[in-house]
Amino acid sequence: MKSSLLAALTLASCVVPGSVFAEEGATTYRVTFERTWSEDTHPADFPLLAHFSPVIGATHGRDYALFSEGATASAGVERLCEEGKHQPLDAEIRAQIESGRVGALIETMEPIRSVPGSAQTRVSVDAGHPMVSIAAMIAPSPDWCAVAAGVSLMEDGRFVAEKTVELYAWDVGTDAATSYRALDADTKPHVPEMRSRSPYFLRDGASVPVGRVIFVRE
């Protein structure tokens, strides 16, 4: 009896009151990537045939960033945001899956041409890869993408039931052109990625979202 009581007291002393243990295993989210970017929301010089490219992203931990303000765009990010193509970014993400820094590749296959419009997919996250970074090219444009970077789906050690994150236009620093349909003007060397400060995406000095991404736990 004494040994059982001692074991129970020892266990209790190791638990910090109010602490929450991180969930183990994987959980699935329905991901809806919505476009709101339109002539009504962003009227300045709004282009004909405007659309978002198919969506690409990754689940990951804190030691990985698909997009990061101040970082230099990879070859894959450059091609996504200049041409709307997933290659070679998909290969870059798969290489990080092999290294363990990324949990899963996220992709949709069709552009988002209508407003309102959306693309939907499902993704699995786990305690080691509880974050999502996801993007689509804003097309036409020099090197601009609609981005949600480093969205954590785990709060206080628990996976959230639902989360909505605004999508903002990013300039990934690979093309110096400043208008939607400008000719290519490659930036060499590349300048750091940042949320776009183009007047196309500002109102009264503040960034206007181009969409949102909604995560719903299944």
Feature annotation, model-predicted:
Residues 24-28, 37-145:
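Structured domain cores in non-transmembrane regions
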Residues 9-10, 20:
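Cleavable N-terminal signal peptides
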Residues 1-7:
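Bacterial N-terminal signal peptides that target proteins for export
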Residues 8-9, 177:
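A ubiquitous, low-specificity "background" feature that marks scattered single residues
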Residues 95-218:
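Mature, soluble, non-transmembrane domains
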